[in-house]
Amino acid sequence: MKLPSVTIKQLLDAGVHLGHKTFRWNPKMSQYIFGSKDSIHIIDLVQTLEMTNVALHEIHKCIVAGGKILFVSTKKQATETISALAKDTSQFYVNHRWLGGMLTNWKTISNSIKRYKKLSEDLKKESTGFTKKEILKMGRQRDKLERSLGGIADMKKTPNMIFIIDTNVEDLAIKEALKLNIPIVAIIDTNSDPTGINFPIPGNDDARRAINLYCELIKQTILDAQKNISTKYSEEIESKEKKEEPKQKIKVEVSKPKIKSDATEKKSTSIFSKIKTLASKK
């Protein structure tokens, strides 16, 4: 396992240490706050560094075990970064709006995904058999479903882990994940409630630079885990092939008994007759 390295200087440069105004804080975050400056809470980056490494380790384990991660953030600063992260690592994402029951009512969501895929397929056909008005209506329905479900269209079941940026905004996702005992990795700012978060990362959840840094670290972690899986799979295949190599067969040639031809038999009979005639003359 090779986790990406990050330093406190990198965290500082990305503004990870900058929390919210002191009057907006959540008292449950007090253990992660270093102090305040100009009425802004400063996050303890020593703890951030340690907890980031713990979270990355868990993400790596999840991927190596064959798990899938759902990335969730519907705030403007993170929508593009979250979708890019999921696409680059072959995971799933929600970056528009969290639909109630996305995890807890998966059967209904699955039906909506099927509807979305059906609309997409129908609209791709050159001859749909629909009127222009119907096609426009179908297009609007498809676009609406794509915004909400496009990032989970290939998700066959509930994810093995969920990553969240801004726990206040994504409180519904957290409630559903907790109900299903899905491990949660989340960025928790000074106004966040860390309750129920399995692997919290204290940090700024508003600055684009900070969000980009978190996502880049996670991306490198997942790619390394996937590389490990690929290497392990190749080694297993190679080992299996060696075990199944057939042993060299030793050919044993069995000579067939010689069969006398008719000519040979006639010759033998002739010689025998001559011997018999000579014997009778004596």
Where are these regions (language model features)?
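N-terminal cationic and glycine-rich segments that engage phosphates or anionic surfaces
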Residues: 1-68, 74-75, 79-122, 228-245
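Intrinsically disordered, compositionally biased charged tails
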Residues: 1-6, 224-282
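Residue-level signature of catalytic and energy-coupling elements of molecular machines
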Residues: 15, 71, 162, 214
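Short hydrophobic alpha-helical runs that function as membrane-insertion/retention elements
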Residues: 68-70, 92-95, 163, 183-188, ...
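Conserved phosphate-handling catalytic cores of large alpha/beta enzymes
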Residues: 101-144, 205-206, 214-229
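Extended, charged alpha-helical interaction scaffolds
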Residues: 128-185, 189
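Short glycine/threonine-rich loop/turn motifs
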Residues: 172-231
